[in-house]
Curated annotation (Swiss-Prot):
Gene encoding the protein: PMM
Name of the protein this chain belongs to: Phosphomannomutase
Annotated EC: 5.4.2.8
Reactions mediated catalytically: alpha-D-mannose 1-phosphate = D-mannose 6-phosphate
Organism encoding this protein: Dendrobium officinale
The organism's place on the tree of life at top rank: Eukaryota
Amino acid sequence: MTGRMPGLIVLFDVDGTLTAPRKAITPKMLEFMQDLRKVVTVGVVGGSDLVKISEQLGKSVISDYDYVFAENGLVAYKNGELIGKQNFKSFLGEEKLKELINFTLHYIADLDIPIKRGTFIEFRSGMLNVSPIGRNCSQEERDEFEKYDKVHNIRSKMVSVLREKFKHLNLTFSIGGQISFDVFPQGWDKTYCLRYLEDFPEIHFFGDKTYKGGNDYEIYESERTVGHTVTSPDDTAEQCKLHFLAKQAGDA
């Protein structure tokens, strides 16, 4: 593509950055991202697996963006082609994985929260996703749990217990989205995707959970990135217009 800024890539989180939490991208935002891609190389890095990212960004997501990094980049695509995949089970081993899962399920069983549904642990290629309420909850229940969690700190308390119990495994526990947190080996956070971007001296990252403990924190703080905190998809678009589209128009 002509007209792109050389040596520069812009990376985006999904939930809360390109879409409302667990919602599909709006046609307006999708059109904006395609316009942005005309002037900069664009990548997406999400904690979810490719199936869930596709539900939010569309079935053609791996060809709609130059890079798509699912599961923090543990499953990586460039120009629609798979370029890398990492495996949590092979890294940790079956016995340690089983110990972690058993303890987590016991903890959730003893947890006194207003409602519980199903799928409390989701096993992904590069991580575990743990949800105290269960991923089968409705959107309304998801919204209610998010409010409840902000008051009672269910996830952060659970993370503190797991972090202490399994400190010998060198795992990272990262809170993201409305109802869950991710568990993965140290270094397998969103900075993992940066190993595929050695050709880009300038890397911008846009995310909403850039605070310590949030799943955008490490890549936001990385020396290799210029971090931008956003509050919504509209805010993302406005900041991008300011940083890239206005700059491109000024250079024209």
